[in-house]
UniProtKB/Swiss-Prot annotation:
Protein name, as recorded: Large ribosomal subunit protein bL31B
Keyword Transmembrane helix applies: no
GO biological process, alphabetically ordered: translation
Pfam families, per the entry: Ribosomal_L31
Organism: Phocaeicola vulgatus (strain ATCC 8482 / DSM 1447 / JCM 5826 / CCUG 4940 / NBRC 14291 / NCTC 11154)
The protein's assembly and partners: Part of the 50S ribosomal subunit.
Classification via InterPro entries: Ribosomal_bL28/bL31-like_sf, Ribosomal_bL31, Ribosomal_bL31_B, Ribosomal_bL31_sf
Annotated HAMAP family: Ribosomal_bL31_2 (MF_00502)
Record's keyword terms, sorted: Ribonucleoprotein, Ribosomal protein
GO cellular component: ribonucleoprotein complex; ribosome
Family from the record: Belongs to the bacterial ribosomal protein bL31 family. Type B subfamily.
Highest taxon above the source species: Bacteria
An annotated Gene Ontology molecular function: structural constituent of ribosome
Length: 84
């Protein structure tokens, strides 16, 4: 790697997929205050809503991901109309 062109905080970081609990180690400049112990070392933790281990394109399975209650909100507004 060339000197002086990479950010100073480029370091190993653990990413955790919150939809299935999968964790993996990579390098990143993401800033976070959370840490996790992974393979005997302590690393910064970045939480992901979806990753390649849970995304339908990579898994081949369709899955509903409701991160902000959008489906519940829709069903409370329009759910009764569909049943008629």
């Amino acid at each position: 790697m060339k000197k002086g062109i990479h950010p100073e905080n480029y370091r190993p970081v653990v990413f955790k997929d919150m939809s299935n609990g999968d964790v993996f180690l990579s390098r990143s400049t993401c800033s976070t205050k959370e840490t996790i112990e992974f393979e005997g070392e302590t690393y910064p933790l970045v939480k992901l809503e979806i990753s390649n281990t849970s995304h339908p394109f990579y898994t081949g399975k369709s899955k509903l991901v409701d991160t902000a209650g959008r489906v519940d909100k829709f069903m409370s507004r329009y759910g009764n109309r569909m049943k008629k």
